[in-house]
Amino acid sequence: AKITIANDSSNMARCLKILEAAGLIELNELPSSLSATDVNNYIKTNLKNLNITPVATNMIAASLNDENNYLGLVNATFAIAAGLTSKELLCQEADPEHVNANILACRADNKDSNKIKDLVEALTTEETATFINNHFKGTIIPYFVKLV
């Protein structure tokens, strides 16, 4: 059975760990940086003889339309954009503490800019949090921390 996973290093590691947690594969120790061309080298045992195929992250949801593709491990942002809902969810990351954060960053010489301050203020409002909660329906959680 063909399964599509992300072809970038960090998301590929996440996908492989999900497949391992689901009991479909056993992994070797993963290196700090993964390569799509080496995906089979990361797998110690392929318990279900899966054809694990790395593709561009933004193409995984579309790969589900391929009758030869058994399943795909889709990031929440792309799943939502493709109209997938929790009804299609078969498994998810086992670690509830796993967090992928988006960071607003600027050059040091711009940190005191009024435009940057206005942007930070706009992005960290209760209105923005409500929009994220309503739009992403719990798949993305707003959490605002000012680091500097």
Descriptions of predicted regions:
Residues 32-62:
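Short helix-initiation/N-cap motifs at beta->coil->alpha
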Residues 61-88:
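A ligand-binding cleft/hinge motif common to bilobed small-molecule-binding domains
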Residues 51-53, 70, 85-97:
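Short beta-strand->loop
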Residues 13-20, 123-144:
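Periplasmic-binding protein-like
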Residues 1, 24, 47-50, 66-74:
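Alpha-to-beta junction loops
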Residues 100-114:
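A bilobed periplasmic-binding-protein/Venus flytrap-type ligand-binding module shared by bacterial periplasmic
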